[in-house]
Amino acid sequence: MSLPKTPSTPLNSASTSESKKLVSVATEGTRGLPELKEKKNMVDRSKPLPTSLLNEFIPKEVLLSLTYAANAGPCPENLLPPKKIKTPKGTLPRLVDHVWHHPVRRNKFKYLIDHPVSLTGAGRDISFLYDVKYTKGQTREKAVCPPHLARSLQSHDGVIVPHKPKTLTDTLIPEEFHIVSSTGVSGLECYDDKYTTLLTDSENRLLLFPSMKPNKRVEVAQLNDVMDTMLERAGVENQEYTGPTKMHKLLHILKKEQTIYNTIFHELIRQVSVDCADRGELLSKVRERYVQMLDQIARQMIDFYKDLVTQRVMDQRILEELYNFKHVIEELTRELCLVRAHDVKLTKETEKAHKDLAQALLDAEKNAKMVEEYHDLYTLQRERMENDMKQLMAERDIWSSATYELALKVIERNRVILARRLYLNEKGWNKYTKHLIILLANKDTEDLALLQKLTQKWRNLVNKFKQEVEEMEESTRETLKIVEKGLTKWQESFNEKDILSPNNGNVFDSVILDFKQWQKMLNEKKEEFTGDVLLSKYDTLKIIKHLQENWTDIGLGIFNRHKSLEGELPSERQYMEEIIKNIQKLYKEYEIRINGDNGYSKILPILISSLDFCSFKLENLEFPDTPLEEWQEIDEKINEMKLQLDLLLNLTGIVPQHIDMDSVSVLQAYIFNMIQQWLLKIGNEINNGNIELQRHMDELHISMIQWMVNLLILMIPNFTDQDCLLKLEEESAEKHDIGVARLELDAIELTRKLYQYSRYLSSSCEGMVTAMALSKSTTSHRNATEDLYEVDKLKKECYEWINTCSCLLSNIKGRKITLLTYEEIEQLLEEEAVKEFIEPEMDESLLCSRRILLP
């Protein structure tokens, strides 16, 4: 606490007479101190006091001694510690006593300046135990509050202390209970100055030496009144003061009182030192011991308070932990109840599942027994049916062999030689047909696997070729961008006014080097469209085309083997032609992109010549005296090159718009998808074709057997000797005519089907067996032409069966029946085979027919 400052006018009046001082002191002694008023009625210090109030204050020397710290202004720069120079005259509030002019005497009274009065709140009192600055309605920063629960706010005298968020600290003691010490007053550094000393506290203020003028009893009485008044005022203020806690109020009172005692004690020491320096020094020592004792008490209080705060914190933390523990116990209890309920539910479900499982096991055992019984019954039934089938097959074989033997005997007895031959021809035709169908199926399977392998290899090569072309185009695009960027940079540099100044040097050298470098890069890219790189690309494209032709030929071979009976190719052939058409478009687009026909081959040489022209112009220009027309021509040429570069960048990776083509990526993906669908269709066509061939063969086989049986029944006479019973001639003749007519119609229809099927199968397998024979002959296979002979045998057996049918029908009808024309025979057999088979067969057929007609 500081007393009100006195006006500056009476402090600076050093020339006032001693008589005026005595009168003022006497008057003040009789009147005493005036009553202190409220703070709002305090006299304004910035204005000089009225004359009527000058005599109402304490003596000047006492007042100056009491308030010299309050009136001490900031330390001038020339009095700061690093600068030890004299204080200019005329800046001090009063003259210094002569005792301070002598170093020895000043050293004797050094205790007066060792413990100055500080008004910055840094006195050595016990108020630093609780560093808090409190004003009505708010608590300043670093406020220390008593322990409180973390989840609530406490209110003390209308002050709400907010809860700060927790932070990581380097101590276990909570931040709200830290003890913050005030900055104490440092010791004075006494300079060898005759008038001043420097108070090195927190503000480095200038401190005047205490007055050493003699004191009277009136001054002591006046000092007593001042102390009482100050204590009274402190009591009044303390009653008005309300802090957050009682500790705040107690410390506030202690601080106020200790400040007053410190100030009064300092003045007493000064007054005693005037009369007796030794007594003053003794009082100073007593004061120092007293301060040390208070300091020790304060430290003990600090320790006690720390223990108290720590205990409170521990209690608070223990309470919080207990609360948390209780909360956790409640949560665990709740979870335990839920777990128990869930456990009960699971137990019930488990018991139910166990019962269901036991019931299911019982049912399974019953079902297993039932299944076992059914299995035994099925086994018995199967064995019985197998035995029956074996018996039936044995009976069938017996009857078949008996029928065959009887038929042979009948044929031999009745001399039906052609019927036996007809049976053998049908049996041979069936054998060769089955073998060729198996060969055809195996060949189709091999070709389909090879076709899938070749198409996959072709797709891989196309993808690789596409990647190479795109990498080349990307490299070309990067080169064009570099050239365009460089041209733009130099054009902008040429447009600047300072670029051609002599101070910048000759910039043409750098430009010419860049132009030549760009010209070299573009020449390399030009070689890619005309040199060995182009030939390499064409060779790769030829390999791709050759591979595509290979799998195309394999596909055509499969289609030729699977024509319809009418000779029409399957629909997959048209689909393949569409694929080939799109592939040709793809090849054409790739050729345009690799040889530069999309515009590169025309624009790139022009661009290179333009760069060469600009380089030549720049080499011949004289720096810096360059005509404006030359610059305009170069600038126009650069603009032209930039347009050409933009056009080339737009043409990269595409073909001109006037060519009706899709994008390469889209077209290529479309082709790959078509090939995949085409392979699936070919696989389905092969399976369906082989199944259809087998079905037609089975139908023809049954039809041929049925026709032969009908022929035998019709040809064998009803009796062969006189012992047989006679039938009615009319019924026999009518039935014979109907049977002959039906036999003729069936023979004509069967002949057409057999001729068409045999010709179709032989034409489908002829190329296949020829290739197989050539392949086997190259490996020196012993039976290289066996499959080829089987095709000829198939046709021969077909022709002989048809020819035998024709002879038999001719003999039965009594007129010549022709089932095949000469042209059809030539189509079925080759010319040489026709000559070999037709004439002998005709003679033999005539002889056989004569034998059949003989009785």
Curated annotation (Swiss-Prot):
Pfam family membership, one: Ax_dynein_light
Residue span of region Disordered: 1-31
Coiled coil location: 316-402, 451-480, 571-596
Subcellular localization(s) per the UniProt record: Cytoplasm
Organism superkingdom: Eukaryota
GO biological process: manchette assembly; spermatogenesis
UniProt main location, coarse: cytoplasm
InterPro entries hit by this protein: Axonemal_dynein_LC_domain, Axonemal_dynein_light_chain
Biased composition (Polar residues): 1-17
GO cellular component: cytoplasm
Keywords: Coiled coil, Cytoplasm, Differentiation, Spermatogenesis
Function: May be essential for spermiogenesis and male fertility probably by regulating the manchette dynamics, spermatid head shaping and sperm flagellum assembly.
Protein's name in the database: Axonemal dynein light chain domain-containing protein 1
Species name: Macaca fascicularis
